[in-house]
């Protein structure tokens, strides 16, 4: 399992916090231009902008406040960019018509030809791959940032090294880092923690070695109980010999196993369990595509209060599924989260 070094994680933390501040400022600027905070529609809006404004005001009422809308637009804007780069760096951003991987440079060329924004194109391509994850019909994804605000976000994204996007735990850490400022502000205020603040204050995700230790000594121990000579034992560095387990209530095959993470966060445990289950299913002769399909539909389940965590966990698992060899031209089941 490839994980971020302490230095790389610290650099990512800094970049994500800066991105949130820039994205929220850019979102606020764009929403003010549209007059979303005003009762009367500005006279300079086009018919298309006026319709987007109407939808955004409806979304604002649903979310509860203008600041909530700012946060929502900022989150969607940055994370569509971030997810697209994760896909591109892993050669998994697929052109929907030609079914071949495209780079961000190629997306930019396509965007120029179509008179669109690079990240709009890249986000649409990503949405084609996981239509259940990216909300293309949401008005928050149609907000156009000013050029200088877009460039600020692109600059931050470009500073993140390519190696970061190849680490299996990188995507999971991004949301905890996204919440850092909000958590700090709530803790400093000493106000009652409720509503939106609950997610910001209570999310603290598990270190990779803890995840590996817990899974290798439960899921791994079960597998070695069934298959004492399994070569997978050599891959589990945290497995402890000689510990007594009672697996009498456990199933006899991976297909019957169900794993539920009741506080799944951004998917650290589920991603690690995915890789262990894939190795187990392959060991008993399953083909990669069938094994992955089975893991997503039969094995992995997760619960989480924060829908943004669910989005990131879903994307994390999907990304690992594609990296493991699931065909990008086949329908990938959405995990049970």
Residue map of PLM features:
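S-adenosyl-L-methionine
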Residues: 320-337
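Short, solvent-exposed loop/turn segments at the edges of secondary structure
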Residues: 295-296, 332
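Short, charged/polar low-complexity linear motifs in solvent-exposed/disordered segments
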Residues: 230-231, 288, 328-330
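Post-Walker A helix-loop "phosphate-sensing" segment adjacent to the P-loop in P-loop NTPases
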Residues: 279-284
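Preference for the N-terminal adenyl/adenosyl cofactor-binding alpha/beta module
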Residues: 1-278, 299, 303-312, 335
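Conserved adenine-binding aromatic site and its adjacent loop/helix in ATP-hydrolyzing domains
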Residues: 315, 319
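Catalytic micro-motifs at enzyme active sites that drive phosphoryl/nucleotidyl and oxygen chemistry
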Residues: 70-71, 248, 289, 325-327
